Amino acid sequence: MFSRSILLRSVRKSLGRYYSSQAHPQTYIYNLLSDTKCRSCGIQLQDKFPDKPGYYRLPGQNDSNTDNKAKTSELNKKYEKILQNLDISDRNLLINNFSAPKQDDEKVTSVPSLQQITPVEADTRDTTKDQQTHSGHSLSCKRCNDVIYNSKTRSIYDPNRDNLNKSEFPIPKLQQVLSTIPVDAPLVYVFSANDFPMGINKDIFQYRPPQQIYFVMTKSDILIPKTNVAFYNNFKKFLQNYMFKKFNVPRENVFIASGKDRWKMTDLYHFIPNYSYIIGDTNCGKSTLVKSLLINHHVKHWKYEARQQRPDEKQSSSASLKNKDFKKLDRLIDSFSSKNGPGTSHIPGFTRDVLPVDIDGIKELFDVPGFTTNENLQDIFDKLNHKQIARITKGANTSKYGSLKSKFDTVKNGQVLSLNGVGYLQFPGQDSMYQIRNVTKFALHKFKNLEKVDSILQRNEIPKSMSSHFIVNRQQQQQQRNELRGYYKRYIIPPFYGTIDLVIKDIGYINIKPTGKKLTNELMVLYLHPSLEAIIRQPILNYIDPPTPKKSPDGTNRKTITSDISKTPFYSRLIPSTVLSDPSSLVLSPPSSDYNQLNQYLQIDESSESAYNDLLELDETNKYDYWIE
C-alpha cells in the first residue's frame, strides 16, 4: 500500500510539472532547479565557494572560514586509522550507519566532503542532488543553518561572521519580485493581521487587475479567537467589503487564516489556485502559511494511519485519537518541519529565491521572497538579536490585551510614552488624559517629558532598573540619543476624535482612548526609528466585535459601522514633520508650528474656516477631515 501511494504521488507530481510547463515555461524551470535549492530560503546550492551565497557543508565537513572549526578527538583519530585499512565497500557501509564516535561538543570529521566523494570537475548541482537522495531529505545552506542554530543571542547581522550579514538577507522591491513571476501565473497576496492594512501595497494593482489576485490575511489568531465563530464572520465580512470598496477586489477572492495555528488550512487549500505564486511583504508570514498547508496534508495521512493501526476499534474518519497518538503526531510534525522547507524565520529577507513546494503531488505552490518599500527596514536589526526580533514581531492577542476589559495604563499632562526605546510618543499637555492598551510586545514606559528621556540617554549607562525599557544594549544608548535628535523621524499624529489605534508595521498596535473633557487641540507627536513605519486607524475591535447600533431620534436603527467603509477613512498616514531646529536640545516646539505643518501637508489655507488651530472644534461631524489615506 505504501509503495502504491508513493508511485501515485510520483505520477501526479510528474503530470503536474508537465502541465505546468505547458502553461508557464518559467515555472517549469523553477521545478527543474528545485532539487538543488536550499530547502529553507530557495537559493541555488553550491559547495565550492564558502564566501558566496548558497554555500553549504555536509555534517562534519571542515571549513577554515568558520569561527567554530571542527575538532578531532583522539578516539576519532583511531577510528579514521581503522577506517583507512578497510575495503571500500566495508568503509562505505560503516560510514552510512552514522555510528562514528563523537563527543557532545565535537563534530565528526571522518565523513568525507563532497570534493572527496565526487570528482572535482563534477557539476555542483549534480553533487547536491546526489547528496539529497543519499540523505533522504533536502539540504539547507550555511546561512540558514547559522540563523536557525547560531543566532539566538547575537546580532543577526554581525559582519564578523561568515555568511551572516545584510548582503545575505536581500529584500527586493515589488517590481523586482514580480519580474520573476510569469505574467499569467496566479498570484496570492498574503498580508498580516498584525498591522492591517499596512501590509497591502497598492502598487500591486499597477501590474495585475484586482480581479486576478487572491488575498489572504494570515496571523489572524492574534485578532480573532479560534472558537468564536461570530467574531470570525464579523471580521471576514468587514474585510471582504473593505477590499471590494477600496480596491475592487471580488469578495470571493479574500480569505482569512492562521499559518501558526494551522487554522482554516483545508479551506485555504481549496481557495488557492494550483501553481500559485505566494507574494507579500517581508515577514508577513508567507512561508509559515505555505509550510502549514504542507504539514496539514501530512497530518491527515498520519491520523489516518494511526486509526488504521487499531483494527479492533471502529474505523471511521471521525474516530478519536488517543493521547499517545497526539504525542506521536507532535513528534512527527517537529521531525517533518525540521527536514522540509520552506524555512521560516522572524528575520526580514530570509527567503532569497522562488521555492517550489509540492503539497500533495497535485497542488504545487511557489514561495516567493518578500518585498518592502522601506529602505531602512534592516537598520533596527543591527541592534537586536534573534530572540529580541522573535519577541517584538510575534504580536499580541487583541482579545487579551486590546478589548474593553483588558488592562490599561493612563498617560496624562504631556507625558512621553517610550516604545522600548525605538519610538517615543509625546502626548498633549494642559490637563489631557488618555487610556493606553498595549497590543504589542514592546515594553512601554512613561517619562515626564522629552527632557527626561534626554537626560537618561546622556548617562554612560542606563540604570539597571530601567534597562528592560530599552531594547538596545547599553553601549548603544549614546548613539540612540544622537539619533533621537536627528536620525529618528518626527511625525505629527493627525487630529482624532474618540478612540484610535496607533499601528506599527510588523509589531502590532497601541489603543489610545481620550478621557475627560477635551481642553486642547495640541497634537500628538511620534519620534520613530526610520526602520519602522506607523499609521493610525479606526479601532480594529469595532470590526471584530461591533458595538450595537444605537437608534436614531425617529426610532429607526442606525447603520452598522461597517457600512461606512467607503465614506470615511479607515486609516490615516502620519504627517512627516521637520526636525527640531536646535540639535543640542529636545525643547518642545510650540503647538502652532505643528498646526502650520499639518495645514501645509493637507493643503489647507491658514485663513480658511477648516484650518486646524486652537479655535477649531473637533467632533463627530469633522473628525476625519484631517485624515489622509
Curated annotation (Swiss-Prot):
Q: Does the keyword Transit peptide apply?
A: yes
Q: Per the database record, which ranges form the CP-type G domain?
A: 171-374
| Gene3D superfamilies assigned | P-loop containing nucleotide triphosphate hydrolases
Give the Gene Ontology MF terms in alphabetical order. GTP binding
Keywords, A to Z, come to: Mitochondrion, Transit peptide
The organelle targeting sequence, given as a residue range: 1-19
GO CC term, one of those recorded: mitochondrion
- Provide the protein's localization: Mitochondrion
Does Transit peptide appear among the keywords? yes
Query: What is the role of this chain?
Result: May be involved in the mitochondrial lipid metabolism.
Similarity remark: Belongs to the TRAFAC class YlqF/YawG GTPase family. GEP3 subfamily.
Q: Report what the protein is called.
A: Genetic interactor of prohibitins 3, mitochondrial
